[in-house]
């Protein structure tokens, strides 16, 4: 896959906060710091993002786009949902280091807000979701389980977590 200059620029900007959060608290990091670390000017940063928190949202968006590109079906049954949950948790485990930095910076609320927005948008396309608050139940479950799992360094088995979450959605 060939990347455009814009995609490369965004990539470097998105990497910048995670590199800097290893050394500094997020609130201490300025847009100038992010731009400098990414090797771009402030104007370039603002061409892509309005504020530094938007970089984290783009990071989540990028992961979702990658995930959706690999997903080949729309879930219709318990097994389909189990496959998606397993894939999401596997991706989360691969991305645990950035999420640890987000958690350490106490910015996990941005992740929860993102999940709520994604699940509520998905509700409109998913005929199996009947209750208007169900997307928030799913988002909250994924958020809380993933954060607790992260606090345990993602030591639990993906299959066990998948079974637990799937059973909560589809009780016997």
Could you say what each language-model-derived stretch is?
Residues 1-6:
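N-terminal intrinsically disordered/low-complexity leader segments
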Residues 76-116:
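Helical hydrophobic small-molecule/effector-binding pocket
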Residues 104-140, 144, 159, 170:
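Amphipathic alpha-helical packing segments from all-alpha helical-bundle domains
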Residues 21-24, 130, 151:
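Cytosolic nucleotide-binding catalytic cores of signal-transduction proteins
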Residues 7-18, 22, 27-31, 36-39, ...:
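An amphipathic alpha-helix adjacent to DNA-recognition modules
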Residues 148-172:
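C-terminal peripheral helix-coil segments that are non-catalytic and often amphipathic
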């Amino acid at each position: 896959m060939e990347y455009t200059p814009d995609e490369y620029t965004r990539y470097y900007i998105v990497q910048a906060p995670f590199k800097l959060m290893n050394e500094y608290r997020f609130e201490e990091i300025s847009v100038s710091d992010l731009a400098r670390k990414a090797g771009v000017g402030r104007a370039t940063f603002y061409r892509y993002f309005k504020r530094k928190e938007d970089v984290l949202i783009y990071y989540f968006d990028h992961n979702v786009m990658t995930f959706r590109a690999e997903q080949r079906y729309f879930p219709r049954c318990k097994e389909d949902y189990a496959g998606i949950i397993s894939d999401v948790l596997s991706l989360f485990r691969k991305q645990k280091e950035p999420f640890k930095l987000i958690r350490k910076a106490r910015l996990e609320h941005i992740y929860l807000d993102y999940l709520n927005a994604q699940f509520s948008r998905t509700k409109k396309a998913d005929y199996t979701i009947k209750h208007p608050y169900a997307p928030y139940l799913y988002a909250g479950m994924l958020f809380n389980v993933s954060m607790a799992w992260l606090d345990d360094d993602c030591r639990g088995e993906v299959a066990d977590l998948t079974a637990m979450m799937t059973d909560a959605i589809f009780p016997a």
